[in-house]
Structures are given as C-alpha cells and as structure tokens.
C-alpha cells in the first residue's frame, strides 16, 4: 500500500477543488533515484555545451505568477511539426515571422496591463483546430474563457482591449517581471479601466489542459525534456481527454520538467471556474505517479510549484 505524508495545502482556500498535498516516499527510493540519475545523464548528453546541465539536486522553486488570463497563440502545422524547437526564438517577442510576431504586437497593445500571460502552444492532439501554415487568421485560445478566438492581424489592438475587460482587479507584478525573477506578487490590487471594448465571440471548447514547457531556444533542457514528457503522456495513456501541448517559456527552466494543468471545476453554474496547477522537476518516469495522484485529489509536494483558482 502506498504510504503518503499529508500536508495542508496552503493555497487550498484559493482553489475550487479540494486537494491534499502529499509527499511520496516512493519518489526517494533507490530505484527512482537511479532512474532520475540515468535520465539526467541522458538529457545532458544531448545538450549543447552552452546549456547548463540538468541537475536533479537543484531545489524546486515554489514561485509562480498570479494571473487572471492565459492567452495561448496556437502554432500552425500538424502535431509532428517542431516549432517549439525551430520557430520559437529565445524571446518570442523578438520573432518577426507570422504568427509569432503577433505576440509582441499584442503585448504592446496590452501595455502594462497586469495579470495576462501570453505564450505560444504547439498542440499534440486534435481536440482544438490548428491554423494552417499560411492561414490569414491568428488562433488564440484564452483561459479561463475556454474559447478559441480567430483574429485577424488588423484586429489585434481591439482584441487586446477585449482581453483587458476580464481584468477588473489584478496584481501589480506582470508575467514579464516574474520571468526575470522579481519579488513575489504583492497582495494589493488595483483596478484597470478600459476604452473602446470590442466583443469577440469565440468558440467554446471545454476540456482540461496539460501543458509541458518545451521551449528549446530558451533553454535546451526544456526543449529536450518536453517531448519526452509528451511521449510519456501518450505512451502511458495519461489524462487522454485533456488538451495536450508544448508551451513556450513559463519560468523554471533551471530545474526544467515544467508542467501546467488546468482543471475545470465541473459543477453547476461553474462554466469558467478552473484551477491552475504548476509543477516542476517532472521526469517522464514519474509522470504517471503525478497524474494518478492528481486524479485522486492529491498534489505531490516534491513536484508542486504552486496553484491558483481562475474564474
């Protein structure tokens, strides 16, 4: 029988679901230690000389951004394409090629609006439509709207205004601040005012999400580990009803193995309620343990970076 050490989840009051935070002795067994050591050696053999090696002894940070919306620019092409390795610049804001140049434009229109994360995502299953390579539309999936918006480049400024409508109160620290390592988000919030709000309809697509950082040019550790974790999801048939994708940089590349889960709160009149759960140091051989415990309402302490509720 699996023994667990239960801790009080500090953020439980801020999550829609009820979770136990547990420590698994199994993760510290000799077998698991050997698996992790061998895996890290394998990854390090694949890394360019300019990348710091993957070190399983590095402490997992428990710092995550506090945010209201997550905007995902859907990469074009089928699931076998590799934009996460080829097309995603070290900093996506410097990318001049479509569709990724839309990220810097959207961010500039948002200005200093806090509480909105913007990433690229490369889908690994077929629950959500993908744009074609030469598509005239930009595909944005917005969480917690749980909607796919198809936007023309000329409408990006209005789309930014539309996105701001959901940020009534937000922390002063932006996601960019978080990525460069500034202090934790202060508790105080401030109101954001909007002008020229334009409505966009979007298509509602209600599914949980599993997102794995695979941003190779940001840090090759994530670029090498990301596809391995995706393969573990697929080979082990884990959370097969979830949207699955590789995502651009979300912090934590020092320890790598970063996975974000969005879990919808399936209750009456809770259409847009969900929990955002961030994990790091997730190795492919431990993914099954993580997913099975999560499905049973347990969060593994050794991999947990933090979480928030979203509405």
From Swiss-Prot:
Under which name does UniProt file this protein?
Answer: Altered inheritance of mitochondria protein 32
Which organism does this record belong to? Answer: Saccharomyces kudriavzevii
Superkingdom is Eukaryota
**Which Pfam families does the entry mention?**
Suc_Fer-like
What protein family does this chain belong to? Belongs to the AIM32 family.
